[in-house]
Amino acid sequence: MLKGTMIKRNKMQLISTHPIKKSDLGFHANLFGGKLLAWLDASAAAFAMEVCDTPRMVTVKIDECIFKKSAKEGQMIKIYGKVESIGTTSLTLYMEARSHNVYSGRQSIILSTNITFVRID
């Protein structure tokens, strides 16, 4: 098993928050999907490093990504994650990106996926 801290496996944890700015928008004034995927991968990598107590973790696989809803300028994106499984050489995280309306406090899942990391020597 990978060396790591004792993180609750079934509890989603807030990892990062990103305000949506004009420069983050695509052609239809929605959050650009590539920007969201970059935030998701970077957040998951930081979480994997924390779980495994090492900065030597790299993304090896991102499962299917289905964009369920759009997000607009002025909303916040909150990225949550939890440990899905820990193997002898890999770690899989379940990740969610949620749009957060700062006025109402409502959140909607806009993307969820599993991301697998391995430790490099």
Language model features with spans:
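Small beta-barrel nucleic-acid-binding modules, principally OB-folds
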Residues: 54-70, 75
